[in-house]
Amino acid sequence: MPRVKGGTVSRQRRKKVLKLAKGYFGSKHRLYKVANQQVMKSGNYAFRDRRQKKRDFRKLWITRINAAARMNGLSYSRLMHGLKLSGIEVNRKMLADLAVNDLSAFNQLADAAKAQLDK
């Protein structure tokens, strides 16, 4: 069998890694070995943080809802319990959006929750 030279494939593979490492600092975008390590690490970070992002946004929504709820004399947990008792199904993302952009609508929801808790 004739000898197979893999120069073209190797060069393409290295070029692909260096292209992915574009914008990295120092030798991390120049040297293949270091760039490859950093590209692998970056992929791990990206994979982890795609899941972390969902948790981070939920935390942010809860913080915003809690702040607006306390302006209405309720804690976050009591507000959510009151909304559940009154049959209002609004997710945390929408509640947080109301708390930031439409405080009067949020206040109406908080009043409904308060009324249900006082029963």
From Swiss-Prot:
Known function: Binds directly to 23S ribosomal RNA and is necessary for the in vitro assembly process of the 50S ribosomal subunit. It is not involved in the protein synthesizing functions of that subunit.
PANTHER family: 39S RIBOSOMAL PROTEIN L20 (PTHR10986)
Disulfide partners: none
SUPFAM superfamilies found in the cross-reference section: Ribosomal protein L20
Record-stated family: Belongs to the bacterial ribosomal protein bL20 family.
Organism: Bacillus pumilus (strain SAFR-032)
GO biological process terms, semicolon-separated: ribosomal large subunit assembly; translation
PROSITE patterns linked: RIBOSOMAL_L20
One Pfam family cited in the UniProt record for this chain: Ribosomal_L20
Keyword RNA-binding assigned: yes
GO annotation, cellular component aspect: ribonucleoprotein complex; ribosome
Coiled-coil positions: none
Keyword annotations of the record: Ribonucleoprotein, Ribosomal protein, RNA-binding, rRNA-binding
Single GO MF descriptor: rRNA binding
InterPro entries assigned to the protein according to its UniProt record, in alphabetical order: Ribosomal_bL20, RIBOSOMAL_L20_CS, Ribosomal_protein_bL20_C
Protein name, UniProt field: Large ribosomal subunit protein bL20
